Amino acid sequence: MPKPKSAYSQPTKFGKEDHHIIVVWVDNEAGVLARVIGLFSGRGYNIESLAVAEIDKKKHLSRITIVTKGTPEVIKQIKLQLGKLIPVHKVADFSRNDPKILFKELALLKVVGATKKLDKAKKLCKKYDGLILDKTKKSFVIQVTALRREIDKLVATLKPLGLISVSRTGAVAMTKGDEVFTQ
């Protein structure tokens, strides 16, 4: 059965859907994340990934990085609505295809199996510059930092080799060169 789409994700005459990374600088206080997420869920916007961390202890600031999908008018509406929330200091939006922005995700992958399969899996992980964090005779845990689609591909390839557990962060983003987007 096909997954129902949100009314906000339907193509319109104003443009087609595209993935966007929305970065929001907020006060680091109780309830702020719930308000930001509530804005998305209350309007039927989907969040594909989410990463949140305090970035300035003195100023009590946190940075929320949200990956979502929508038409240009939906993304504009999301940004406007986020900007109206009291604890929000700044909102930035980047297309996933923006060549000026670096996007990465981190994944921890656990593989368990016989020696031959483990050796094959380790060789495969080296192609992704994976870092082995833990290993035994029957298993290993690897850390991979890459684009979402690259991690998806690695996960699919490792499944038949004994992949038993996956833990992933949401996307994080940073401008290239000396350009900075900050609070």
Please annotate each region the language model reported.
Residues M1-S62, K69-Q183:
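Long, contiguous binding/interaction regions
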